[in-house]
Amino acid sequence: MSNPKNKKEKTFLGIDYGQRRIGLAYAASPLFISLPIGCIEAGNTVEATAKILFNIIQERSVSCVVLGNPIPMQKGQKSALQEEITKLSSLIQESCGVEVILWDERLSSAQAERMLKGDCGLSRKKRKGKTDTIAATLILTSFLESSPPKIFLKKTCPKPPVR
């Protein structure tokens, strides 16, 4: 089995960002299967949340972050949550030097909620936090399934922006 600490491997962190909770999923070579890794509490600010995520990115030697982007159903509108996600993306790129991909996450939380409620029969209280983790897994899976094979062979990631 591969060693996730090997910096030459392509590793992915999927993030379902929320203002209270953040769901996380992870994938690494050789299989690139999206696995849920849990849910964390968001920081009081986007900057505080970026610091929390920085530690996870470093700990898991992540080379690419797939950050769920809640694109509104009606074009032309940008939500406050999207503004935070754009800021978080920039902070992660600047502090970690990893590639961040904003990925359409429309309805991922609703799909996760249906899965947990219908298939698993979990109560609302037991679904808390699990929905975010499953949504992160769905976001990362969607990205991995739609990506060309060459992305998995890429050994290096973009350098952080020069200040």
From Swiss-Prot:
<keyword id="KW-0378">Hydrolase</keyword>
<dbReference type="GO" id="GO:0004518">
    <property type="term" value="F:nuclease activity"/>
</dbReference>
<dbReference type="InterPro" id="IPR005227">
    <property type="entry name" value="YqgF"/>
</dbReference>
<keyword id="KW-0690">Ribosome biogenesis</keyword>
<protein>
    <recommendedName>
        <fullName>Putative pre-16S rRNA nuclease</fullName>
        <ecNumber>3.1.-.-</ecNumber>
    </recommendedName>
</protein>
<dbReference type="GO" id="GO:0000967">
    <property type="term" value="P:rRNA 5'-end processing"/>
</dbReference>
<dbReference type="InterPro" id="IPR037027">
    <property type="entry name" value="YqgF/RNaseH-like_dom_sf"/>
</dbReference>
<dbReference type="InterPro" id="IPR012337">
    <property type="entry name" value="RNaseH-like_sf"/>
</dbReference>
<dbReference type="InterPro" id="IPR006641">
    <property type="entry name" value="YqgF/RNaseH-like_dom"/>
</dbReference>
<dbReference type="GO" id="GO:0005829">
    <property type="term" value="C:cytosol"/>
</dbReference>
<comment type="similarity">
    <text>Belongs to the YqgF nuclease family.</text>
</comment>
<comment type="function">
    <text>Could be a nuclease involved in processing of the 5'-end of pre-16S rRNA.</text>
</comment>
<keyword id="KW-0540">Nuclease</keyword>
<keyword id="KW-0963">Cytoplasm</keyword>
<dbReference type="Pfam" id="PF03652">
    <property type="entry name" value="RuvX"/>
</dbReference>
